[in-house]
Amino acid sequence: MANVYDTANQMAADIKTTQEFQDLKKAFDLLKLDTVAYGLFQQFQQKQYEMQQKSMQGQDFTDDEVKSLQELGDKMRDIQPIQNLMAKEQGLSQMMDELNKIISQPIIDVYQGK
């Protein structure tokens, strides 16, 4: 019987060699060179994390929190290194979605009686 954890670890290593992953890594490295863009990116990540924590605790977001996150997102949309990173994230996400479909297929087959 195959050890699925070994297979998963190999897949993780293989993902690092894909063009999509390499493009994302390069885009992130370039983003870090722009201190203003990287600072905004870090602020956005922190706010997202804080809101996710509140959500997990069943707490509602204040209008100010939502507005602050939206304003920060709006600022980020105009910054080229962030736009580039987001585009590369989409490419990697598409690949990950395709992999998830492949991995999930046996479960789908069970429920479809295959």
Curated annotation (Swiss-Prot):
SUPFAM superfamilies referenced in this protein's UniProt entry, alphabetically: YheA/YmcA-like
Pfam family, one: Com_YlbF
Signal peptide positions on this chain: none
Gene3D superfamilies to which the protein is assigned, alphabetical: YheA/YmcA-like
InterPro entries the record matches: Com_YlbF, YheA/YmcA-like_dom_sf
Record family assignment: Belongs to the UPF0342 family.
Protein name, per record: UPF0342 protein LCABL_19440
Protein's organism: Lacticaseibacillus casei (strain BL23) (Lactobacillus casei)
